[in-house]
Amino acid sequence: MLKVAIVGKPNVGKSTLFNRIIKVNKSIVDDKPGITRDRIYANAEWLTQHFKLIDTGGLMLDEFDFKKQIELQVNYAITEADVIVFLVSYKEGINNDDHYVAKILKKHKNKKILLAVNKSETRNKDSYDDHEYLRFGFQKPYFISANHGIGIGDLLDAIVDTKLKEIKEEDTFKFCIIGRPNVGKSSLVNCILNEDRMITSNIANTTRDAIDSNFKKDNLLYTIIDTAGIRRKGKIQENVDKYAYLRVEQSISRSNLIVIVLDGSEEFNEQDEVIAGLAHKANIPSIIVVNKWDIVKEKDEKTMNKFIKTIRIKFKFLSWTPIVFLSAIENKRINTLFNEIKSIRENLNLKFNSKILTDLVFKLQMLNSPPLFNRGRIKINHVTQVDGQIPTFVLFCNNPEYLHFSYARYLENEIRKSLGLNNVPITLYFKNKTDKIRGKKNDK
């Protein structure tokens, strides 16, 4: 797939252009320079042509916090991109930072570089000011306004004009990594990808955007989504933190699996429980990762069991969730995490015959009869699986409105156990036997 990177100094509108092209507010946009620190990926389409778009942090000549890390991220993006959109601002004009970026880009002569002049909505179309931008040596400039959508079509025409061999996209399994700030989420991503994909430091919240990374392991495709650390709502004061909190919820909504990262070197707190609650609310599989296991003091053979017991008490609503102990910074026990991810992926794809399901539920009713109600006893006479993000089963019975939630929970736990679905949530729908099934059956 064609890869396109947007590069430029801070505050020229890179993230606004990124969002305009993908039609989603994926990058955090604010007037404050340096809001985008990592490189951010998204799929885009123009005139039926698909391409991968990359947003990057701003480059500056002067020294500033995270300069080396941001330059490393931008260089990664430039290296992997086929097309580079060099973005400058008509409103602010050209300065030394723009020439600094141009100097970096000129080292990549094998790349297609498109110069785009953003914030040009006030420019007179009849003006002859191209010469100022032609000095960069990147052919004619494209005058655009990312905010107003002006000139974007011409720029996209030039982007998709790049010829590449078509690569068929395969199914990918998406999982997001969530947790409070500084528990090691980005270190875990870097460990998995074997590169400094994220900017990491001891300063809380050095990752602000949700960032997608595609990779392959054991011939299976994955997309990993790293998110900003979630602070307590009372401490969310800056717009950036509010945006990041919403981005975490969006990341969860497009994931197949949630990895909840805890800091093993500190006591678990209320915010950890709030974050785990987001995973529970999403009703998709999750894994609890106890990170920084290398610096947990005075470990013995009982330490891990003590942690597990504490987690099961604090996060009792995630009783089925696997727990993994690892050290991202030392790259230890990472395979344990992937064994769980692979197992969950396989379980989500399992399909069960209706006869097997019906026989199972019949036996469960024999072992523990449904409670009585004023019209008699509820009887479940048929079960089928339908399509869903998690294993989803429809149980047909008489008077489902009288089924007590405790009996539904009994069936859910026993069905999960009997079918070997111990590490994923399942959904049960109780329908009147005269109701029609919505969704595709799995009766093979």
Curated annotation (Swiss-Prot):
| Record-linked InterPro entries | G_ENGA, GTP-bd, GTPase_Der, KH_dom-like, KH_dom-like_a/b, P-loop_NTPase, Small_GTP-bd
Record: residues binding GTP 2: 179-186, 226-230, 291-294
Question: Where in this chain does the record put each EngA-type G domain?
Answer: 2-167, 173-349
SUPFAM superfamilies, per the entry: P-loop containing nucleoside triphosphate hydrolases
**Keyword annotations of the record:** GTP-binding, Nucleotide-binding, Repeat, Ribosome biogenesis
Q: What does this protein do?
A: GTPase that plays an essential role in the late steps of ribosome biogenesis.
* Name of the protein this chain belongs to: GTPase Der
